Amino acid sequence: PWHLQFSRGGWETNMATFFITLGVYLFIRGKNNYQILIWSIISFLISMYTYQSPRLIIPILIICLLIFYKNNLLEIIKKIETKKKIILGLLFLILSLPLILQFTSGEGSARFEGLSIFSDTGPSSRVNELRGEHNNLNSFKDKIIHNKVTAYGFSFLSHYLDHFRPDFLFIRGDPLIRNKVPETGQFYLIEALFLVVGLLSLIKNRFEHIKLLIIWILIAPLASSMTYQTPHALRALNMVVPLTLLMGYGIINLWFMVYGLWRKIVIGLVVVIFLFEFVHYME
């Protein structure tokens, strides 16, 4: 139910998540058709104009898409006339220019600086504290071990991993009351089974778009992880799409893993547990 409470509140991140998903879908559909690819890029740009998080996620996602489907894209580029290439390049530059200007301006970075972990002086103070415990404050070894890069790096890593904690995903949800339903995770607990089955099946069956799905899941919480408040269900909302796809893949494979009476038993148990969790969520 991760996206349900946010979709009722009119948050901008809902629209951003929609256009990210649409952009990925159109990119895959248009990997052999540049006209569809144009709409994919437009969708990605709209998502970046809609909310802050995609401004970090989308460039990384596009780079990954270009790498994964480079052979298809090279074939398309060869077929496009030089005049059209110039027009498309100028169009992309014009549409991207406001984003670039905002990102490089002080006004555009002000919000990020206010929420960023890098504006927190805690890790920096901790570095000085740890260095003070040694005899030589400026020794090379201590500078390598205790410095701002490692301090903020570990802080970022900790915040990043927060978004994959089982208690966040399936048990308690977001620590912020306004971003959660009490006593409920971001997903139903039964969906943890589908997630595990989906992940194992994805690795075993070598699904065609396995790289894209895994990368999407991994980069989805990057922007949220750079803020001091994690895990954050709102800023990491785009995680819901690849995780839901993975769970759906798990449901399909679970169906084919059991047969006969066992299939009926498993379906019955899943339905009962799901209904119980749904009623609990609605309460």
Each language-model region and where it sits:
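Transmembrane alpha-helical segments
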Residues: 100, 269-283
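Membrane-integral, polyisoprenol-dependent glycosyltransferases
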Residues: 1-146, 150, 155-255
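Surface-exposed recognition patches
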Residues: 246, 266-270
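Intrinsic disorder
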Residues: 254-263
